[in-house]
Swiss-Prot record:
Stated name of the protein: Vacuolar protein sorting-associated protein 18 homolog
Gene Ontology terms: biological process: autophagy; endosomal vesicle fusion; endosome organization; endosome to lysosome transport; intracellular protein transport; lysosome organization; negative regulation of intracellular estrogen receptor signaling pathway; organelle fusion
Keywords assigned: Acetylation, Autophagy, Coiled coil, Cytoplasmic vesicle, Endosome, Lysosome, Membrane, Metal-binding, Phosphoprotein, Protein transport, Transport, Zinc, Zinc-finger
Subcellular location: Late endosome membrane; Lysosome membrane; Early endosome; Cytoplasmic vesicle, Autophagosome
Amino acid sequence: MASILDEYENSLSRSAVLQPGCPSVGIPHSGYVNAQLEKEVPIFTKQRIDFTPSERITSLVVSSNQLCMSLGKDTLLRIDLGKANEPNHVELGRKDDAKVHKMFLDHTGSHLLIALSSTEVLYVNRNGQKVRPLARWKGQLVESVGWNKALGTESSTGPILVGTAQGHIFEAELSASEGGLFGPAPDLYFRPLYVLNEEGGPAPVCSLEAERGPDGRSFVIATTRQRLFQFIGRAAEGAEAQGFSGLFAAYTDHPPPFREFPSNLGYSELAFYTPKLRSAPRAFAWMMGDGVLYGALDCGRPDSLLSEERVWEYPEGVGPGASPPLAIVLTQFHFLLLLADRVEAVCTLTGQVVLRDHFLEKFGPLKHMVKDSSTGQLWAYTERAVFRYHVQREARDVWRTYLDMNRFDLAKEYCRERPDCLDTVLAREADFCFRQRRYLESARCYALTQSYFEEIALKFLEARQEEALAEFLQRKLASLKPAERTQATLLTTWLTELYLSRLGALQGDPEALTLYRETKECFRTFLSSPRHKEWLFASRASIHELLASHGDTEHMVYFAVIMQDYERVVAYHCQHEAYEEALAVLARHRDPQLFYKFSPILIRHIPRQLVDAWIEMGSRLDARQLIPALVNYSQGGEVQQVSQAIRYMEFCVNVLGETEQAIHNYLLSLYARGRPDSLLAYLEQAGASPHRVHYDLKYALRLCAEHGHHRACVHVYKVLELYEEAVDLALQVDVDLAKQCADLPEEDEELRKKLWLKIARHVVQEEEDVQTAMACLASCPLLKIEDVLPFFPDFVTIDHFKEAICSSLKAYNHHIQELQREMEEATASAQRIRRDLQELRGRYGTVEPQDKCATCDFPLLNRPFYLFLCGHMFHADCLLQAVRPGLPAYKQARLEELQRKLGAAPPPAKGSARAKEAEGGAATAGPSREQLKADLDELVAAECVYCGELMIRSIDRPFIDPQRYEEEQLSWL
């Protein structure tokens, strides 16, 4: 058989697509140009399947991409549309004349029911090849099946509903399990539930649909030729109650609610629209004699599942007396009617025919039309051909329909991704609201459009709707981009003017107090809105001018605070002499620059509070920039003025640890003028090191001298290390102070002696106090009695110096005795050294014949060797080789030089006479051989190479010379 459903050909007949009449909108409000660059694809596109059946097609069903068609009376063709080139033929095995009446395929595409005209029903499962008759169903001509979408699976249908031509509704359940020869039958049970009646008695059950709502309620809609019945109820709990028995039992005593229409086609058909597989259906369409009953399905309603119902009459030429419709399918916004020679699509929103698709006569009359809910594709067939409809972008023009119906919310929903259409909808909605005098809503819509700003603003001005105009301006402002600064400035200024004008008009009216407060709150909300902050900040100058022109000082301050323009706020308070409020603003916002600017004003009026604020600011303030304000304030010299300045400067120095010289100098000047008792304490606390004090020493000296603070001057002299000046000035104040100064140059004994002589001269010549002069001798060991005697007058008797002279003589005698003792100790030490040298000359060591070199492990006596006191023995050449790497470069050079000279020196001559002659000749020529050997020994054998310092220094030396590391590494490869 040829490949099926994988190749398509273009439709042999052209579909007539009828565009619904739409009012011309002319030039759009926004200026958008809907430039359609590509040809619009039709919503419904028909394609003929490249398939020629071997026999007449009697029935066709599609679900979940599974297609089943009956050919002739005994063949079933099954096709998985995902594998269209692998069709499956199943023989029904019927030898009688029974024909296929209808076929039913569940939502999973797994369970197929074949109703025969002989009142028999066959069951075929997707995963099996066996056709199984349903014995319990025999005798019933099945017209409809209501599948159980909630409980149905590939292996079981769950409880389902079956409608017959006799008006009976049965409940059944099918299982795909074959179970062998003696296994259970596929029809687990088949029991009657209800009988549908019309006026003449039982009527065929044309359609059955069963659904379960989100709240657990069950809904069943059943149709006959003229009636549509609804069964609504909640299923009982338990496994047995999963079926529909309880639902239908509730209508035993009274009939269910139904809709009835008088005209009769002889049949009817019900179609549901379900957005997604296994989701709740959204809409229904019932094809009956009077037309198509269309509406929404609302599972939340207690008494009826149907809502928003309306009957669409059949298009012209369609109906019971003309060309009756054979089938109906429902999409999101259309229902399609199948006639014998054509398909007509009707918009469910307007009732207009949007498609009239005629079929060629060569294919024969159309039989039926079905929809695959899983893919949304529509299938129609004749006895000799199969056609498929693709539905593409069905909602593309729905927005225009809703727009014409003034259902703007739905119109916006369906054109949200099309800016040009959305702008048109918004403009129409804004115009509609404006005509309805809903000005605020109109302003909100206009703000979202691209309509001309000037026209809209003028429109509201002419209508004197300032509130709506403000709403429009605010929303336009919020939609501006950062680069649109000019527009933002215009809008913010205009809005401010509108608010101020409205506040001014309402302020004097006591009856409009509530409105005034509301407007005031709206204005403040506008000024403080984070969305507008950037634009308001850019326009703050013009807004301040507007506020000033209206005299609205309250909002001027409020706006300045919002814009963080605290300088303007503080200046306003200062101008109105509200200094404490100005300081409160400064303290709250902690801006150092504002403190620097306004401190000169505030310190004249609230000095204590301002200093408290400075202290609260701590290190955030630079005290140097506050000195000018303090200087101007403290020039009056009043105690309170100076004390506040001192309080802040002390805080800077003692708490903040300021080291800036200007601060310390100013504090010194304050102390010198207003608090001299703290001056000396400050100087002493600062220390006596000239490099560690933070004030200017020369300035401090001049300042203290000007104000006559001599003790402070003495301290500064000491810091400057001008000890003579310090002693001279201290002698004018206090001799004890001078003594303290004289002891300061500890390392310069000559200067100390000189200073003490100044003190002694002053005591002797100025105070004429001999006892105090003698006390000076005791205080300074550098002074002798002979140094002080010249200061005394001639008439002074020796009795005053007797003790001092005796003490001096005793000191000299003690010094002489110390010198003699040191000389004796030096002589004894020299004698001990001579004795040790004599003992060292006689020391020796014993070498045994079997002793070996500590380095090469060869017999020691074979070559010249060295013997160390530690016991280690080395050949001379081995020791030389071991010592050389550890010597510094200059010693290595010296070693090579000694070796070269020793090699060039003549060997020692035999005999004493010849030896003496050789020594004499060598002495004249250069160092002797013995001298060279001695130098070499001193260089090489000064200490044992294993026990000496050389071994200790070698502990961090690498085992392999870095210069030979690569060579050594390669040798191991």
